[in-house]
């Protein structure tokens, strides 16, 4: 298994629609308009967060149950920024829509800009032949409110290509998150 370079990522996005919309260079903004970087990097792709957020609140239930999750536990926010309460979390989605090749596994890592502020990004691997918007989970590990910026970089995707194709892909299994659009809540 090997990690894929900027050239491979660019080719797969342009010729096979692996990432849409696709930014073929790393965008950092300018001195008077700084942004958290996004787009192609040397061995990955920095994704942006869309302006749709679901901020967790515990006013409706005392227990979080992934098999019976209460959608009322979230407050929907559409904004260029999202404020996450202390020791809480928010869900969002990527601006980008992904189509993962059959011989590729994609791993997501948080960006250091957020990690150094106590904001952790969690995303499970994007499996072979999965497609959709990526649902992002932001944990605010601090005792203060934390800010997330929409349409700026929030995490980096690393593409690992196997020496052989998998026998059964996510699409073949009929995965429950296949083709998801928007922020997607837990499914069982």
Swiss-Prot record:
Its EC number is 3.5.4.13. Gene3D superfamilies: 2.70.40.10. InterPro entries: dCTP_deaminase, dUTPase-like_sf, dUTPase_trimeric. It catalyses: dCTP + H2O + H(+) = dUTP + NH4(+). Pathway: Pyrimidine metabolism; dUMP biosynthesis; dUMP from dCTP (dUTP route): step 1/2. One of its GO terms (molecular function) is dCTP deaminase activity. GO terms for biological process: dUMP biosynthetic process; dUTP biosynthetic process; nucleobase-containing small molecule interconversion. Belongs to the dCTP deaminase family. This is dCTP deaminase. It comes from Pseudomonas putida (strain ATCC 47054 / DSM 6125 / CFBP 8728 / NCIMB 11950 / KT2440). The gene is dcd.
């Amino acid at each position: 298994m090997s990690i894929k370079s900027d050239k491979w990522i660019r080719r797969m996005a342009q010729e096979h629609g692996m990432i849409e919309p696709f930014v073929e260079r790393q965008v950092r903004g300018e001195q008077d308009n700084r942004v958290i970087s996004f787009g192609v990097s040397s061995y990955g792709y920095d994704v942006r967060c869309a302006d749709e957020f679901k901020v967790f609140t515990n006013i409706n239930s005392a227990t979080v149950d992934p098999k019976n999750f209460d959608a009322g536990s979230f407050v929907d926010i559409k904004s260029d920024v999202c404020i996450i309460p202390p020791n809480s979390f928010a869900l969002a989605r990527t601006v980008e829509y992904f189509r993962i090749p059959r011989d590729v596994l994609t791993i997501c890592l948080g960006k250091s800009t957020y990690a150094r502020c106590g904001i952790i990004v969690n995303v499970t691997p994007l499996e072979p032949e999965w497609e959709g918007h990526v649902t992002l989970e932001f944990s605010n590990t601090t005792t203060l409110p934390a800010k997330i910026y929409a349409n700026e970089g929030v995490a980096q995707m690393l593409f690992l290509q196997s020496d052989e194709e998998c026998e059964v892909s996510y699409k073949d299994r009929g995965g429950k998150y296949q083709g998801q659009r928007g922020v997607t809540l837990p499914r069982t």
